[in-house]
Amino acid sequence: MRKKQKLPFDKLAIALMSTSILLNAQSDIKANTVTEDTPATEQAVETPQPTAVSEEAPSSKETKTPQTPDDAEETVADKANDLAPQAPAKTTDTPATSKATIRDLNDPSQVKTLQEKAGKGAGTVVAVIDAGFDKNHEAWRLTDKTKARYQSKEDLEKAKKEHGITYGEWVNDKIAYYHDYSKDGKTAVDQEHGTHVSGILSGNAPSETKEPYRLEGAMPEAQLLLMRVEIVNGLADYARNYAQAIRDAVNLGAKVINMSFGNAALAYANLPDETKKAFDYAKSKGVSIVTSAGNDSSFGGKTRLPLADHPDYGVVGTPAAADSTLTVASYSPDKQLTETATVKTADQQDKEMPVLSTNRFEPNKAYDYAYANRGMKEDDFKDVKGKIALIERGDIDFKDKIANAKKAGAVGVLIYDNQDKGFPIELPNVDQMPAAFISRKDGLLLKENPQKTITFNATPKVLPTASGTKLSRFSSWGLTADGNIKPDIAAPGQDILSSVANNKYAKLSGTSMSAPLVAGIMGLLQKQYETQYPDMTPSERLDLAKKVLMSSATALYDEDEKAYFSPRQQGAGAVDAKKASAATMYVTDKDNTSSKVHLNNVSDTFEVTVTVHNKSDKPQELYYQATVQTDKVDGKHFALAPKALYETSWQKITIPANSSKQVTVPIDASRFSKDLLAQMKNGYFLEGFVRFKQDLTKEELMSIPYIGFRGDFGNLSALEKPIYDSKDGSSYYHEANSDAKDQLDGDGLQFYALKNNFTALTTESNPWMIIKAVKEGVENIEDIESSEITETIFAGTFAKQDDDSHYYIHRHANGKPYAAISPNGDGNRDYVQFQGTFLRNAKNLVAEVLDKEGNVVWTSEVTEQVVKNYNNDLASTLGSTRFEKTRWDGKDKDGKVVANGTYTYRVRYTPISSGAKEQHTDFDVIVDNTTPEVATSATFSTEDRRLTLASKPKTSQPVYRERIAYTYMDEDLPTTEYISPNEDGTFTLPEEAETMEGGTVPLKMSDFTYVVEDMAGNITYTPVTKLLEGHSNKPEQDGSDQVPDKKPETKPEQDGSGQAPDKKPETKPEQDGSGQAPDKKPEAKPEQDGSGQTPDKKPETKPEKDSSGQTPGKTPQKGQPSRTLEKRSSKRALATKASARDQLPTTNDKDTNRLHLLKLVMTTFFFGLVAHIFKTKRQKETKK
């Protein structure tokens, strides 16, 4: 007797805890603890909320709020800067402070000069729309409230009344207005992101701060309007809420509005009309809206580079995609304020190095350290007791490295990078163990240094960064989904120190941190222009400020690639407030629309025409040239790096005073086209900058980015090809099984969003026991108690007869999948539904079914909005989407089941890019409702317990599975298991069944049922007792029960789930495609499978095999029970799975999709895990 094991409930509890964590995901924007140390590709995931970054592994706290993971290798924040809670500082008049500000030490954007010209924003109001704020932080302070726009609460109330605003509160002199527009009545869970953003824009910490340096925002003397907006009732409602906040900010006198949040890859065209009107309203009133570009890098997320065949890999979404906004990318400057440590080098020189700490080391104390390799083995730590362990990054998680060091007696850990020029990474907190991350260069210095001591300094300093000046790898690329140029400009967004909740300070990274700096600069520049250009209207000053700011930005250069970073990544370049403030010239496109040039489709040769504007009273002599570049390709993927092609020669031009003049630069890239098309067959970008200097020996004065596409950008394919067409069985998000390339397992216990990401048709496999219950009149499947599960599978896939844990594509002779359905209402292969991996945003998706004459017999409802599947790292960003409206149940437009035959299932959609034409993808689908005919009699031998049927089944479609099912009670759960046929076609019936607790249950003959299923999902089943009764010589009784005298039903009903027919090579001859034996004359020609060929080949020919190399339905263990205790453990689980069909996400409402996904993960995971453990145990025991 095989001994069975009890369920591992300890593991089940852990799994449930994990599920609970996932569902309670509320990102808190502070530094996410890094838990992984495995290198990953340099991308990120955007959530529809504020854009701070979690820069190593995605945290379970990222589903809802601000942070968005960076490229799995970088740091989010520096908790070492946290302060203990303090009483908020007074917001009234305070003497000028003498403590140095962070900007005094490091000002890469050169803001101080502009601050002086514009009085640091005194007398102005700025608005921040975000997820939450700490209204009591010490940084909310005015130096002189007599210069404030709103002198009192009464002044605010008067302004509110003038504009019909009946809500919002006065907080203090600094925070003139606060209101929660989310209308959810809850206190904001996340207060940190908005607090951090507001500090960058307008923080003004007092000199009494415990920080070594004082926080001062770009506009420290401006008053704040804090407006909380969070997703509560869907994205559309969310957009309407922040639209109302925009209108109120404008009416309350805001000079600039910062919006550091976004919905990746969403198109501006899909925003509600009231949101678009709010943007237009702000523009008309001269109010600048500054948005963050997002932290999603590009199509593919943090683990995958975009394919070189699909150049539309930009993911900048809304609201950043709006033309009227100023959209900001993130870059890391060459110097950074950082914690430091000092070592004595071999020549006795002090060497300072930047460190990023988690749980700080004691300052000014000399620590001994010892090298511990990669911190994996016990031997690595033989010398670390009482010392700091110096460990190289790689191989295992940071958490494990730190835990191993602690176990070995180390007093702390230093982990150094395994990559040159990498960004710093915050390490996880492991039992409060002091730990710090350092660069590879410094780590190697420590390793080789003979003096193994290090001292951590108390005061942070400005030191060069290991990465140098570089675009942040998480920063989202353009173009937008609409095909427009974004981002507009770049600003520092890497490890930015600012205010966070509870009167603390921390470093965060993300485009959320870049945007408020630019917002502050825009506010200061507009205030300067009020004096400089008093005759201009506010909207004219806004337009000029945006163009000047972009023109005066410095195009960032990639020293590694010897080329400028792409305009699709950096926009016009790094913001430079000093240059903007002093600028008397700027450059725009030829129509003076904006300071960027979008050429759309171009050929090998084209021209770039720009307009140079001179607002000074003197003529200006300039030199200009253009850089020409494209994308670098690495194998089959874009490297997300620039590739320089050439530069034009410098030319000279003179611009008259107070005038403008056009400049045209001819570009000829024809000599590169052959090689570039070989790497990027569907086209490539030709882009760069037109740069201007006043003197060839001096720095760039101004520049303008241009972008063209060599090809037809609008008509690039929107949908990835179906998985059925893949030569190696893989897709962008799906790795093929190396042993069986056509293996496509169904959803099973693992929710599909976590694995099956490709383009295909789905259907549903309903187990025999459920079908039987339905046929016997059970109307509500929730009332069915069964060990089996209704499972979503892929049309054209079938399981092995003895193992339904894996599904494989079964193909016609022409290579197309055998996608067949039987729409008879039994829930087994009754429908097909479209699932797609979209490479681009599309609109007006509709499915239709055509008969063989090309007539449309059915059309689905329209899905108006389709968002590209840009990432599959989290449940909130899927690698594919299932479209519920495309579900076809085999009926025509009048609701009648169509005739048996082959139909074309067509999915039509149109990319949203300008000039795009409609595209479509076709699938062949067989409809067949013909019920299998089975034997009406059988014999049973009590000697060897073999059941022999009188004849083989006759089917219209090939036989998928021929089995004996038996059902018994395992405790209180009805349990079904199956017996596959022996090689001679007989079945060996067991005398007893084993329970999960190791006991046995005796089986009666009435427990057995003969079940036949064809590849369209038609099922016939007959009790074995009826088969025995049908035999002329009644069989010997088995002692368990009497054979009933009722005759078997002639034509039982059907079902299906999918696989090649059960063929027995040694039994000659077997049935042909008609389901009849070859020696019997068929009444008509064999029915065909829709491909024009007879479905079933004769058994004497070699059986078809799937990609696993096995014949579908072949039974390795002769006549043994196939213990397929399927995946359902209770009626509740079955009901959950059934209802899940109507909850699968579509692209209509992404935040709703997220809620659906989270709920489904929890509900299906628990019940599925229980049943999965049952099934796994049984299958292992069967194989023993």
Curated annotation (Swiss-Prot):
Pfam families found in the cross-reference section: CHU_C, fn3_5, PA, Peptidase_S8, ScpA_C
EC number: 3.4.21.110
Motif LPXTG sorting signal: where in chain: 1144-1148
Broad class of enzyme this protein falls into: hydrolase
Nucleotide-binding is among the record's keywords: no
Ranges where the record places region Disordered: 33-117, 1029-1150
InterPro entries: C5a/SBT2-like_Fn3, C5a_Peptidase, Ig-like_fold, LPXTG_anchor, PA_dom_sf, PA_domain, Peptidase_S8/S53_dom, Peptidase_S8/S53_dom_sf
Location in the cell: Secreted, Cell wall
Membership in a protein family: Belongs to the peptidase S8 family.
Protein name: C5a peptidase
